[in-house]
C-alpha cells in the first residue's frame, strides 16, 4: 500500500534543524567572547580604553619610529598659564647660584666666585674702603654706589667704610665666621673716625642706612630678633644683597632670609605670585621646586623681563619685572 508523503512535517523538521544550528552557533560565539574578552584600563574621569591596539602607524615622512616622550615631570610647576609663560631649562647645579642662596653649615656654598669684581674705576667718593683689594659680586657695584651717594646727600657724611666683603678676617674687628661671605653678596660696614675704625651700629644719622637699605636691595642679614631662625647673634654691621623686590618683601613681612625662603614657596606660577612695587617698578615673585639631580623646566614670562635665582636648598625663585598690575609697598 502506498503512503502519502507529508511535506508539512518535513518543513517543520527542517525549520527545527535550522534553529538548532543557529542556536549552537550563537552559544559558540558567546563562549568565545566570554573567554577572550580584552581587559580594559580605567582612565581618569571614568572613561576607559582597551590595552591592545590593532596597529601602530609610523608618522608619514619621518623615516624612523618616534621615541615616546618621557613621563617625568621636569617643570615642577604644572598648570601655569601657557598664554603668558614659556619655560627655560635650568640644571640642578644652578640651585646653588644667585643672590637668594642660603649659605650655612647645612647648605655649603658651591660656587666658584668667578663673578667677583673690584671697585677700581667704579667707586664714587661717598664711602670708604678698608683696602683696595676688597671685591664684591659685580651685581653689588651699582647699588652700593647709589645707596651711599643717597646716604651722603641726606646726611652730609662720607665716612662709612666697607671693612670686609667676601673674606673672613681672623683676629679682625669682625672675626665671626660667616660662610655666605664667599658669595660676594655681602658687606661688613664700619666707620672711619678720628681715633680709628669703629663698629657700625646703625645709630644716629647712620640709621638712614638701616631704614633705606632695602630700596637698594640690601637687608641686615642677622637681626637681633631672628636668632632662632638664623642661628647667629645680631650683627648690626653685616648686610646682604638680595635684590630690591626681595629686600622690600622681607622688610614688609618682617622676615629674615631663612624665613623668606620658606614663605616664598607658597607663591607659584600656576597660583598667586607675591607682588610689590618698589621705586615705581612693579614686581611679581614666585617659586619653582627643582627636579632633584635633573634639569628643571622653569616657567618664565614671554614678554616681561625676569631673573632667576637658586635658593641653595632645592628650588628656583623667579622675579618678574611685570608690565601689569601694581601694589604699593
Task: Please place each PLM-identified region on the residue numbering.
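Extracytoplasmic cell-surface/polysaccharide-interacting catalytic and binding patches
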Residues: 2-235, 239-329
